[in-house]
Amino acid sequence: LQPRRTEAMQADLLIHADWVLPVDASDSTLASHSLAVADGHIAALLPRAQAEAQIDAAKTLELPGHALMPGLVNAHTHSPMSLLRGLADDLPLMTWLHEHIWPAEGRWVDQEFVADGTRLALLEMLRGGITCFNDMYFHAEVTGRVCAEAGMRVLAGMIVVDFPTRYADNADEYLRRGLELHEHYRDHPLVRPAFAPHSTYAVSEEPLARVRTLADELEVQVHIHLHETRDEVQQVLRAHGERPIARLDRLGLLGPQLVAVHMTQLEGDEIARLAETGTQVVHCPESNMKLASGFCPVQDLLAAGVNVALGTDGAASNNDLNLFGEMRTAALLAKGVAGSANAVPAAQALRLATWNGAKALGLEDAIGSLEVGKAADIVAVDLGDPHTQPLYHPCSQLVYAASSHQVRHVWIRGREVLRDGAPLTLDPPTIIEAARQWGARIAEA
């Protein structure tokens, strides 16, 4: 009798790489493995010999010297603010906001600004291996449209503030526009709406309570700046007799749906309460240092069981959208703040920028790791550069030595959006020219 031949698995794409870092439960580094993609999802992750024997792929890609990793998740940014990069630097947060950023936004922000700024941000993020980001800005419907066209995954933040802008006159109008955004994108595979009340000092109690009710009804995340600076905490304490976290807790907003950004001013009981409620925290180390806002106690949060993700913040306060840089800075800063060399080791830093980010955005079942059944959001990094050689530990090199320019290929939901470092869904010359024109207009004003 002849042995029964096993029918080959059909796949759209089979990638052979020297290393795969799936960001699984054991933080594995898999040598000489292959990853198969079918219908936009990961169909198999196998040793190369098994993959060659068992998988029949429409296309095969050889990536010697490369590591495959999950797409990076930028858990907090303001993508259109890429057009304000370098407008005002070396200033504390409130001076930066009140005297420079908010006046510029009041004059310039419209749908064209948001579209051009978002495209510039997408170009930078895709080239740096970011496949999903959590955005907070005006005209989120435009950001959603641009991301859908480019094949980028986004949580489009439906912003809420008390004061009038060119976008809306009051909190009611912000919420109405947010609900329209949700209705438009509620079933979109890449664009997912979220509420984005700016902060506890820019949004009063009634709109915050409405955000909580609507977020519960619609099952969406709530994205907010929280405990960013000492002055913010003191301002809210004087105005309301309680610290911002306590205020949100009283309003019922703490919980897994809340994405709390910055969190540099935390006391022990607040960390315990964040852990108890399952509240998500986003650490933006480079922006916080540049604005002298303080240090997020990442090691204490992680030790307490709080999920911590990484964000770049906007390009106006960072001044780049480079999560490779944020991983390295987060790992180094955590060691200095905790006084411990093993605080946030390389594998944990990579997790902050991938799986933890996905969890913060409520997407951990779909993205954040390279596992069978998840969406094929994949990044290939060339580790052949001088500063990532020799290669003893791929994860350490990715976190402590690699640069965003080493990202060579990117797929989102199985669609190739970056090939050999060149974007396939964006037009760089047009985007850069639009940015130059905006820069000239703003500088001359």
What spans do the regions from the language model cover?
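Histidine-centered divalent metal-coordination motifs
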Residues: 72-80, 223-225, 262, 313
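Metal-coordinating catalytic core of metallo-dependent amide/deamination hydrolases
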Residues: 142-264
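His/Asp/Glu-enriched, well-ordered alpha-helical/loop segment
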Residues: 250-257, 299-385, 401-402
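Active-site microenvironment of metallo-dependent hydrolases
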Residues: 1-33, 37-43, 48, 54, ...
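Active-site glycine- and acidic-residue-rich loops that bind
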Residues: 134-137, 194-210, 289-291, 360-362
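Active-site gating loops and adjacent loop-to-helix segments of metal-dependent hydrolytic enzymes
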Residues: 83-116, 153-172, 230-257, 277-280, ...
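Alpha-helical scaffold segments that flank or form the walls of functional sites
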Residues: 85-151, 174-187, 436-444
